[in-house]
Amino acid sequence: MLQFPDHMRPMKPGEEDAVDALLRAAFRGPSEADLVHALRRSGSIAGETVLPMGDRIVGYYALSHMIAPKGWLCLAPVAVAPDVQGRRFCTRMMGMLTQWAEKSGQYIVVLGKLSLYERGGFSAQRAGNLTSPYPVSHTMLAGPKDDAPVVNLTYPKSFAELE
């Protein structure tokens, strides 16, 4: 029998262990779960979203406050349970997030695989003028307008601590 996910929603208190297990399974290790723990401890997380399916969480993403530019968010990590990967859940989650960013006027940056995130609405071209401690060639942007801002990105300290 086919199973379909429920609607994306904010993570609820008490779901941290389920998210931790999802991150460890999706990334085959603790690094992304450790990043989320560090972001939570530092107060950098702006929001955590889950994609439930039945009695489990099969998708997750976190948005964190950038140090600079003020008001910008960064997306990391994004995870989908290994047994449901390939069903475009990530693309759907990213599509809804990028639509929200455009409509709300919120800039969001992400570092990762271009084909994955561009399918969801992020743009590498718009990120071309950004300066970053990470490879700009793998940095993408979502948000208002079709501009290509010229700004310097400073990520939450938790990112550098895990390098």
List the predicted regions and their residue ranges.
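Short amphipathic alpha-helix that is part of the acyltransferase structural core
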Residues: 1-35, 44-52, 56-57, 74, ...
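A conserved beta-turn-beta hairpin within the catalytic core of GNAT-like acetyltransferases
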Residues: 66-75, 85
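Conserved acetyl-CoA-binding loop-helix of GNAT-fold acetyltransferases
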Residues: 80, 86-99, 110
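Conserved active-site alpha-helix within GNAT-family acetyltransferase domains
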Residues: 103-136
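Short, solvent-exposed loop/turn elements at beta->coil junctions and helix N-caps
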Residues: 36-41, 128-130
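Short, low-complexity Ser/Thr-rich regulatory SLiMs
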Residues: 65-67, 82, 144
